[in-house]
């Protein structure tokens, strides 16, 4: 059983704000593992179907980071939460070529997907653990 008191109030508020804006939001990865083990997570990561630009619009105290693999850091005075958009595992076009931008850079890491696609593209470790906070 997960002790809700060990979940960051800030992470909960981010997920609730995503939900209010009609987006999904889940705790993901190591923080879920720690919670399942009864430990206090060191940090919290969130996965969502909102694009980085949509996350940035919702949270004024945030910044988009990364060129190849875009993420959003949402922060307050004491915490920084990393918010990642669900990604698709698809990195090929229908004819089998890698998807590239106009400059020739491979853009497979920024192809948005859904929860199922995001789960399948992650390695089968703690990175594929998702926790819904719908009842918190």
Annotate each predicted stretch with a short phrase.
Residues 1-134:
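Catalytic cores of the polymerase beta-like nucleotidyltransferase superfamily
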């Amino acid at each position: 059983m997960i002790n809700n008191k060990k979940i960051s109030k800030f992470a909960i508020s981010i997920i609730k704000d995503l939900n209010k804006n009609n987006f999904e939001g889940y705790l993901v990865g190591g923080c879920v593992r720690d919670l399942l083990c009864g430990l206090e997570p060191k940090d919290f990561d969130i996965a969502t179907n909102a694009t980085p630009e949509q996350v940035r619009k919702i949270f004024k105290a945030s910044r988009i980071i990364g060129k190849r693999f875009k993420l959003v850091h949402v922060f307050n005075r004491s915490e920084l939460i990393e918010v990642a958009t669900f990604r698709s595992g698809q990195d090929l076009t229908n004819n089998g070529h890698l998807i590239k931008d106009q400059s020739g850079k491979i853009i497979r890491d920024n192809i948005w997907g859904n929860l199922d696609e995001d789960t399948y593209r992650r390695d089968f470790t703690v990175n594929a653990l998702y926790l819904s906070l719908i009842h918190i």
